[in-house]
Amino acid sequence: MLAMGTLLYGCQHLEPQLTIGDPSANEPYRSQLRWLEPAPTDTIIQIGELAPQSGGSLWARMRQGFSLQAKTQGVARVDEQRRWLMDRPAFLTQTGRAGSRYLHFIVGELNKRNMPLELALLPAIESGFNPNAQSPAQALGLWQFIPATGRRYQLQQRGDYDERRDIPSSTRAALDYLSYLHDYFDGDWLLALAAYNAGEGRVRDAITRNRARGLATNYWNLSLPGETQNYVPRLLALSQLVNAPADYGVSLAPIADQPYFQMVALAQPVDLAHLALLSGVHERELRMLNPAARGRARGRLLMPLEASRRLLAQPDMIGKAALPHVAGSEEQVVAAPDTGGAEPQVAEVAAPPGV
């Protein structure tokens, strides 16, 4: 079986191999985060027929927002990538375990912008939904921003904090970039996706060459690097599997259409290891939700939904996990809700006086 890294790409770079973080980080949550696995040979079950969960099905919501499916039908390169994915169920399963943490948030952000919900699956292709994934070209995070593109979209990068790993910030930056590319290429999402992988300059030059030769200038007719030739069909193929799993002999483990995490505003930095002991949430889970924190959350904290409710009911828990801190020139610590329009709602928890 191919190493997982061979499936993954980076935003605006052409390095196919990734150095993936410790896969054991997902082990405690394997059963609850599995999403795509081979269907039983004697039956094929679609998500709507599985045990009902409050909030409805996120898969059903995603399908309602799919708008690129017409571009997937009868395309040989998409069919090839679909078979390629189906031959690698371990990738689909491992990717989905992590993706279940983030998909509801990403879908919500896409809905706000009226963007195709197939794009919610892009981190599966970019990073396997691993926020710690890093390429040899230094692309980082769920959305695989290289340093220059991260700076272009105001993602902070310093020694103790790299916002390319931050789930909300990197997601919004990625959608900003995709929206820009969509406009740049006159509303063509396939060209926008190709440019997300290869850079708009490379795609623009390929269009210019074809136009000069009297050739078609759509994505399928452009001469692009091999990685980019596979990148867009692979996303479309994955969306086919999600859109019609029964047609392809896979089953989707249920994901409820409800937030997986809640954002909590912090007045002081919090030690994740200490908070894990106090809250009962596994430290690895806190680190996967707060990968930019590097063990110390500042400003805001992402917590699994049920754990955040317990936290709000016991605000002294934050105080016990708080670290002594003096704001430096690069940050300002406040006890105010995040104003970035985050989904789900941000809750404010201030540390008790004297902590």
Protein language model features and the residues they cover:
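Primarily a LysM-type cell-wall glycan-binding module
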Residues: 253-283, 331-338, 344, 349-355
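An acidic, Gly/Ser/Thr/Pro-rich helix-cap/linker signature
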Residues: 9-114
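Substrate-binding clefts and substrate-entry loops adjacent to catalytic sites
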Residues: 82-94, 129-136, 144-172, 176-187, ...
